[in-house]
Every structure is written in C-alpha cells, then in structure tokens.
C-alpha cells in the first residue's frame, strides 16, 4: 500500500531512480497496483528525460504488500515501484525493468507490453 510521502523506485529508463509520492488520484488514503499517483523526482541520472524536483504522474506496478488473487494465490514483490506516465497514460521511458503485476485491462496496455515479465 502506497500513501503520501512514500519513497518509490522507478522501473523504467526515463532517467529517474527514486520518486516521492505527493498525491493520490484515487480519492483514498492508500493506493495499490494499477493506481495512478502524483510523484516528485528525488534521484535522477545525468542526461535523463526527467529533471530533479519536477512533478509527474506515475502508475504503480509493484508493491511490497501481499496481493491476493481470485484463485487464492498471493503475489508480493521486494520493492515498491512505479512507471512514469504522461497525461495520456503512455510511459515516458522506452523500457520497463523487472516483473510487473497485471494492470487494469485496457488502461495501461503500453506499459504492460514494454514489461519483461507480467505476473
């Protein structure tokens, strides 16, 4: 579960490495996989597509909290990770690193197609 002031890893090659959650767009106090959040970049690599301190939207692709599926299986990851997106929902980077949990159907198909592994 992600809430305000959570430090997250970035799972794409947009140039950001760490971001801070500064707002939730789902109207609740916490967000999970597939939710869109507002983030501020904290750690960036030189000559990347993003700048330090700028505000972006991001979709959550991995959470540490165990998520139960309908068939009874449980999935949890070792880190909280996001992919930076633009206003249309397309990713800013061209690659997505690490596994990605299935996102809501039709909303982030571009992010899922770039992922190495979809669980």
UniProtKB/Swiss-Prot annotation:
Gene Ontology terms: cellular component: cytosolic large ribosomal subunit
SUPFAM superfamilies: Ribosomal protein L14
Gene3D superfamilies: Ribosomal protein L14
GO biological process: translation
PROSITE patterns documented for this protein: RIBOSOMAL_L14
CDD domains, per the entry: Ribosomal_uL14
InterPro entries recorded: Ribosomal_uL14 (IPR000218), Ribosomal_uL14_bac-type (IPR005745), Ribosomal_uL14_CS (IPR019972), Ribosomal_uL14_sf (IPR036853)
Annotated keywords: Ribonucleoprotein, Ribosomal protein, RNA-binding, rRNA-binding
Functional summary from the UniProt entry: Binds to 23S rRNA. Forms part of two intersubunit bridges in the 70S ribosome.
Protein name: Large ribosomal subunit protein uL14
Organism this protein belongs to: Ehrlichia ruminantium (strain Gardel)
